[in-house]
Amino acid sequence: HKAMAEIGVPPHQTAVISGIGCSSRLPHYMNTYGMNTIHGRAAAIATGCKVTNPELAVWQVSGDGDGLAIGGNHFIHANRRNINLNMILLNNRIYGLTKGQYSPTSPRGFVSKSSPYGTVEDPFQPAELCFGARGHFFARAVATDAAGTIEILKAAYNHKGASVCEILQNCVIFNNGTHDSVAKKEDRAKNAIYLE
């Protein structure tokens, strides 16, 4: 909300499109156009929204499971097409809404309900996926750093073309502490590198 207020685009010129998952209730809390779509299809629907109405500021919100598993193909092509679309990827490294299955960003060896002996796959790195699809803008922040998150969202909006903002979040129920190395202010100072 704060980033959008600082950007200054009126609500009637903004759309927030989401998929399914913990991230995806956001359109219901916004005083903008919005749609909570089906699993994995948020980037495709947001693309259609932007192409149909190019003057609309379109924000697409997905989680790591929604956006990179069933929606991975749409994520790739939204980056490749490079239309002026702002994609927010809320990454908690787990399927939290469906009660704790591993996601495309869960680390190798991660034990969950769907991987009782640990995952055998290496995780997707959203930045690599973005740039591999010829994306031009990628930024990452941690949800506990409100000022940093606001700054990357504003930078994404000001970028002309597709932008991806990965926001690292905690899931206190099924994956608590997953981003502790950067979530706490004192640790972030030691472990984070800020680039512009």
Question: Residue locations for each model-derived region?
Answer:
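Generic secondary-structure signature for well-ordered alpha-helical cores
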Residues: K2-V9, V51-P54, R80-N84, L90-R93, ...
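Conserved thiamine diphosphate
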Residues: E55, S103-A156
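Short, hinge-like loop/turn segments at secondary-structure boundaries
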Residues: Y33-G34, A78, S103-P107, A156, ...
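Thiamine diphosphate
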Residues: H1-W59
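Short catalytic-loop micro-motif centered on adjacent basic/acidic residues
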Residues: Q60-S62, F137-V142, V164
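A generic, well-ordered mixed alpha/beta core segment in the N-terminal half of proteins
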Residues: T37, A43-T47, V51-Y117
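Flexible, low-complexity linker and terminal segments
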Residues: C171-E196
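Glycine-rich beta-alpha junction loops
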Residues: I20-C22, N92-I94, D145, L168-I173
